[in-house]
C-alpha cells in the first residue's frame, strides 16, 4: 500500500505507540483487501466495548493504547456490557461492573465520546453525504451507507479504533464507487403498515437478496424510525450493509436498475413473522430499544404505559 511521508512516520513510531500500532493494523488490513492507499475519515464508531467480549487482555491492551493515544476525529462508542448508571438494579455483579467501568475510563482517556449507543446518528455523530467513515455497528453502517449516502465498511472494533487514532482507513470495499453498484432489484408489493413490518421486510429482503446490494422500489412512505428498524433487520438476515431505496437513498436515480428482480409479497411478510416470533406463554423480560430508541419512540412507549403498572418480576 502506498503511504505518504507522514503516514510512514506514523508507522515508524514517530507519533507514539498507539498511532504506530494503529498504522500496523490499518496497513495489514489494507494489504489483505488490496487497498492502494489510506483515505481520511470524518468520524468513527467503535464496537467491542463490553468486558464480556474483551476480558482482561482487552482491558490491558486498551490501557496501553490510552497512555499516549488520542483520537483525531469524532469518535463514539457502541453499547457497553451493562447500563453504566443502573447496573445494580439489573443484577450486574460488582466485579463485572468494576472491569466494565475501567474499560470505559480507558476509552474516555482516548478522547472518545462515551455515548454507548448503536445509533450514533441520533446523538451527534451524523455524517454528510459522500463522507468516508470507519463505523463498526452493522445497523449503523447500513444506515450511514443507505440513508445518508456516506461511505463505510463494516469495521471490526480494532480497525475502527485504529482509524480513530490515525484519522484514516484503508480505501477498499464500500469506499469505492465500483463496489456500491446494486446487484438485484427488489420490488415490494406487500403492504408495510406498522413499525414491526419494517423488521419483517428487512428479514424477507435479507433472505432473498442474500449477500447482494438491493435496489428497492414500491415503498410509498417511510420515516426515520422505520428506516432504523429496516437497516437493523436487512443486514442481520443476509444483505450487504448498503441498499438503494427509491425516494430515500441519495443518488439512487444515478444507479442503473439491476436485471435480476425479486418480488416481496404479503406472504413473505407473514413468513418473516412466523420465523422470527417466539411463541411463549411466560414473559420474564421486555427489552425496548434495539437499535436504541429515538426520542419519538421513547415518547410512544411512555404514552402506552401511561396510567399502567409494569408487572412484578
Language model features: what each stretch is:
Residues 1-313:
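Non-transmembrane, aqueous-exposed alpha-helical and coiled segments at domain scale
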Amino acid at each position: 500500500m502506498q503511504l505518504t511521508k507522514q503516514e510512514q512516520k506514523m508507522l515508524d513510531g514517530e507519533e507514539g505507540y498507539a498511532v504506530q500500532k494503529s498504522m500496523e493494523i490499518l496497513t495489514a488490513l489494507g494489504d489483505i483487501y488490496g487497498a492502494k492507499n489510506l483515505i481520511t475519515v470524518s468520524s468513527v464508531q467503535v464496537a467491542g466495548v463490553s468486558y464480556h467480549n474483551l476480558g482482561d487482555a482487552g482491558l490491558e491492551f486498551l490501557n496501553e493504547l490510552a497512555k499516549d493515544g488520542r483520537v483525531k476525529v469524532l469518535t463514539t462508542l457502541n453499547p457497553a456490557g451493562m447500563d453504566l448508571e443502573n447496573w445494580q438494579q439489573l443484577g450486574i455483579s460488582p466485579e463485572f461492573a468494576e472491569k466494565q467501568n475501567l474499560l470505559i475510563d480507558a476509552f474516555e482517556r482516548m478522547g472518545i465520546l462515551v455515548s454507548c449507543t448503536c445509533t450514533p446518528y441520533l446523538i451527534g455523530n451524523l455524517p454528510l453525504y459522500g463522507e468516508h467513515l470507519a463505523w463498526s455497528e452493522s445497523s449503523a453502517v447500513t444506515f450511514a451507507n443507505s440513508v445518508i449516502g456516506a461511505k463505510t465498511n463494516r469495521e471490526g472494533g480494532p480497525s475502527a479504533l485504529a482509524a480513530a487514532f490515525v484519522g484514516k482507513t484503508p480505501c477498499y470495499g464500500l469506499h469505492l464507487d465500483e463496489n456500491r453498484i446494486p446487484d438485484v432489484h427488489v420490488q415490494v408489493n406487500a403492504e408495510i403498515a406498522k413499525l414491526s413490518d419494517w423488521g419483517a421486510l428487512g428479514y424477507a429482503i435479507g433472505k432473498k437478496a442474500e449477500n447482494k446490494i438491493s435496489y428497492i422500489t414500491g415503498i410509498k412512505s417511510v420515516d426515520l424510525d422505520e428506516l432504523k428498524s429496516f437497516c437493523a433487520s436487512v443486514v442481520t438476515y443476509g444483505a450487504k450493509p448498503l441498499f438503494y431505496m427509491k425516494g430515500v437513498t441519495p443518488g439512487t436515480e444515478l444507479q442503473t436498475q439491476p436485471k435480476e428482480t425479486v418480488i416481496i409479497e404479503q406472504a413473505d411478510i407473514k413468513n418473516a413473522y412466523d420465523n422470527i416470533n417466539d411463541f411463549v406463554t411466560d414473559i420474564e423480560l421486555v427489552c425496548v430499544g434495539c437499535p436504541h430508541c429515538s426520542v419519538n419512540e421513547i415518547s410512544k412507549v411512555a404514552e402506552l404505559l401511561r396510567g399502567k403498572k409494569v408487572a412484578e418480576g
